[in-house]
Design a protein with these regions (language model features):
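Interaction-mediating elements
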Residues: 1-116
Length: 116
């Protein structure tokens, strides 16, 4: 049940969405037991985002949530960040210094009318 939610202050083209979806689908395999088969991707563009009090340059926040009953190894998150950062920079025009990626693993995830 991985979910990757991308907020960007700039517009996100259809091509960029496809490229990011593909990158997220590949990178999520860094998390043990996760794959693109259950991945949900959400994209919100033209968001009002300030980074360090400034909204004059594009910036982005990527939220990654996964269903996990045990702790996700820190190395998995590191690998995900390393794999997706250059794609986000290229596709969204966001300087990596203006990008946050936030991770959350939870045992509480619902699907199809029930919780796992």
């Amino acid at each position: 049940m991985p979910v990757v939610h991308t907020y960007c202050s700039a517009p996100i083209s259809d091509g960029a969405r496809e490229a990011l979806k593909a990158a997220y689908g590949k990178a999520i395999a860094a998390v043990p037991g996760k794959s693109e088969a259950w991945l949900m991707c959400l994209f919100e563009d033209d968001a009002h985002i300030y980074f360090a009090g400034d909204d004059s340059e594009p910036c982005a926040l990527v939220d990654v949530s996964v269903f996990a009953r045990s702790e996700v190894p820190a190395g998995a998150w590191e690998r995900f960040t390393e794999e997706v950062t250059p794609v986000i920079a290229r596709e969204l025009g966001v300087d990596p210094a203006r990008l946050y990626i936030r991770y959350d693993a939870t045992a509480n995830f619902g699907w199809n009318g029930a919780n796992f």
